[in-house]
Amino acid sequence: MATQWEVVIGLETHAQLSTVSKIFSGASTQFGAEPNTQACPVDLALPGVLPVLNRGAVERAIRFGLAIGSTIAPRSIFARKNYFYPDLPKGYQISQYEIPVVQGGQITIQVPANEKAGKAAYEKTVNLTRAHLEEDAGKSLHEDFAGMTGIDLNRAGTPLLEIVTEPEMRSAAEAVAYAKALHGLVVWLGICDGNMQEGSFRCDANVSVRPVGQEKFGTRAEIKNLNSFRFLEEAINYEVRRQIELIEDGGEVVQETRLYDPDKRETRSMRSKEDAHDYRYFPDPDLMPLVIGQDWIERVQSGMPELPAAMQQRFVDEYGVSAYDAGVLTSSKAMAAYFEAVVAKAGAANAKIAANWLMGDVSSQLNRDGIEIDAIPVSAAQLALLLQRIADGTISNKIAKEIFATIWDEKATDEGAADRIIDAKGLKQISDTGALEAIIDEVLAANAKSVEEFRAGKEKAFNALIGQAMKATKGKANPQQVNELLKKKLG
């Protein structure tokens, strides 16, 4: 019988904190500047300069810790992580080792269904070990100079929050679900812009396998700097296959650091994996211990936004939307704000139709144009009026879609755009019973065959008659009334 393998995954995520200046200097953190134009004497490790801790970076770490229910260390220390690399000017990185600022905590994830594997969607809680503050290194540019490597120190000293999980994830799907949940949270909190292309949010995956039922962990490989959710999933799946095949062929997994090649969709060895003692951590003598009083924590707490989970439950309770819909609507702070702005104008009675529109037509248009909800050309007030016109029977849902597209394309700024377009194009729904009866009589007379088929028991013929009636009114008839009148006349 073939061995059944269990996958063990832990993630280390580097979230670049959204401060204007670096963690230990006043140099700018702006992305995209000319190489080495945003590196000051502290970043360059010139003699005689000392680091000064950025208060904003600490407050962002506290905010994150409060959001995940962790313990904020009343006293934490910075350490020197010693290693040599050309883009590390000091010969060490300032980080935290023994006492991190954020200790423990957890994040609840929603793992989607996998129909191919026959797995239903489920919820899981991932425990965090810690989150600590550290500085980023510079960047080595290997492709810009023939036969040489360029060094750009603009990134050196940029504040990072390294967030470390327990090795509790058991599949690439769980790892991706966690990474997405974490990404959404740090962006929601405003502590990180989440731009993965610019390296603001990147993951290292520690992957190992072991026989099902074995308690001892297998030898792990660390896959570095995965900067997209797709790469994270592909890299983990490849690494799992590689390790299982290696063991089953009689080989041994070596503890090492690996890189993912997205073109070949495979991981490759980078270097042997170091342990903590290889870095010779010791307290940084240039930095005092970081002391965080309860009053500081309370000040940060008072400025915290409503968290996604709490808002999701509120949407279910207040607006009567499903838990799934509430989860989609709170997937970003901007989406949630837009939804609430629409409901505030359209009324709570229209909350469900507002949710359906945001997840349907609005989302598809956003995807079509490649823009985010905060750049939507249709204001919340404009959409609210449109939904009110559906609710009061002025227009049908089909006509509303046409009006929405018109407002979107013309980038209308007037709040009453929906009413203006309805009047200008004569789009009001025909709800007059007498007028509809006359139209339906004409449709029945012109479609005698469909009438016979319906009376013979063919339900499709009824739908064909509805279609003809809607066609005769150019889509402006009230569909419900058409349905009722047809049934009445057909007996």
Curated annotation (Swiss-Prot):
Keyword Nucleotide-binding appears in the UniProt entry: yes
Entry keyword annotation includes DNA-binding: no
One Pfam family from the record: GatB_N
Catalytic activity: L-glutamyl-tRNA(Gln) + L-glutamine + ATP + H2O = L-glutaminyl-tRNA(Gln) + L-glutamate + ADP + phosphate + H(+); L-aspartyl-tRNA(Asn) + L-glutamine + ATP + H2O = L-asparaginyl-tRNA(Asn) + L-glutamate + ADP + phosphate + 2 H(+)
Coiled coil: none
Any single biological process term in GO: glutaminyl-tRNAGln biosynthesis via transamidation
EC number: 6.3.5.-
Record keywords, A-Z: ATP-binding, Ligase, Nucleotide-binding, Protein biosynthesis
Quaternary structure (record): Heterotrimer of A, B and C subunits.
Family stated for the protein in its record: Belongs to the GatB/GatE family. GatB subfamily.
UniProt protein name: Aspartyl/glutamyl-tRNA(Asn/Gln) amidotransferase subunit B
Organism: Burkholderia cenocepacia (strain ATCC BAA-245 / DSM 16553 / LMG 16656 / NCTC 13227 / J2315 / CF5610)
Name of the encoding gene: gatB
